[in-house]
From Swiss-Prot:
Bat coronavirus rp3 is highly similar to SARS-CoV (SARS-like). It comes from Bat coronavirus Rp3/2004 (BtCoV/Rp3/2004). This is Uncharacterized protein 14. InterPro entries: Protein_14_SARS-like. Pfam families: bCoV_Orf14. CDD domains: SARS-CoV_ORF9c. It comes from the Viruses.
Length: 70
């Protein structure tokens, strides 16, 4: 009786471990994809901020001649 209980528990443990490893393997690519999307969004945000700063600088550069002109 004891060996059959042991074998049953061992089998249950192995199935659970196998299922858990499979689930982790399936989730890892999704996490990697989420990370890539987050990095792309961060780059887009930095580009937008850079574009705004560039436009502000350009607006100031256009104003300069009128400030120092007669």
């Amino acid at each position: 009786m004891l060996p059959s209980c042991y074998n049953f528990l061992k089998e249950q443990h192995c199935q659970k471990a196998s299922t858990q490893k499979g689930a982790e393997a399936a989730v890892k690519p999704l996490l990697a994809l989420h990370h890539v999307v987050a990095v792309i969004q961060e780059i887009q945000l930095l580009a937008a901020v850079g574009e705004i700063l560039q436009l502000e600088w350009l607006a100031e550069a256009v104003k300069l001649p009128s400030r120092y002109c007669c």
